Amino acid sequence: VTTADIAYAKKMGLAIKLLATSKKIGDQYSIMVSPKMIGMSHPLFAVNDVFNAIFVKGNMLGDSMFYGSGAGKLPTASAVAGDIVEAAKVNGNTGHFWTEEKLALADVSTVENKFFVRTTAAAEEVKAVFGDVTVMNDVVANEISFVTEKMTEAAYKECAAKLNGIVSMI
């Protein structure tokens, strides 16, 4: 994430947050940590500085957020690195601590997301590849940005391969 990405997000009324997300998709689970753009109306938008939050959508509970002071950047980075190493050790197989049932993880390339893209390509080229997207061109000179419709990461990569000049993607 660059200062230009942050400037684009601000211009769109969004904030870029590093989120750990999990979602059940059929009989599999999508689990990832990645930067996401969050709108001002979302409770996570206001989480800043040393504070962390967990936002939960439950079928009975509805939307709930748990908010508090975090551990700081170095302890948190160490914990994340430890979690990644542990996940690699179990080769993608995880289980609940209260059951022996294994959880099937969804292939990240099959999970749908919207993608924020910056490029030096012309708006016409972008629309020819990604469809009728809204293009923003007044933040960084000689560059445009857009947000895709929901698509899988595999579909995004296929489209991105057809477009020259991609500067960044979130």
Language model segments and positions:
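ATP-dependent carboxylate/acyl-activation modules
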Residues: 43-99, 105-110
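Low-complexity, glycine/alanine/valine/leucine- and proline-rich hydrophobic stretches
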Residues: 34-59, 70-74, 130-141, 148-150
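Generic "edge-of-domain/loop-turn" microfeature
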Residues: 38, 61-63, 124, 153
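Active-site lining segments that contact anionic ligands and/or coordinate catalytic metals
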Residues: 28-30, 51-53, 61, 112-116, ...
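Substrate-binding/catalytic subdomain of NAD(P)-dependent oxidoreductase enzymes
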Residues: 1-46, 51-53, 72
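Fold-independent oxyanion-binding glycine-rich loops
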Residues: 21, 35-37, 58-60, 68-69, ...
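A conserved regulatory-domain signal marking ACT and ACT-like small-molecule sensing domains
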Residues: 82-170
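Short, well-ordered strand-loop elements centered on a beta-strand within folded domains, enriched
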Residues: 27-35, 46, 63-67, 164-169
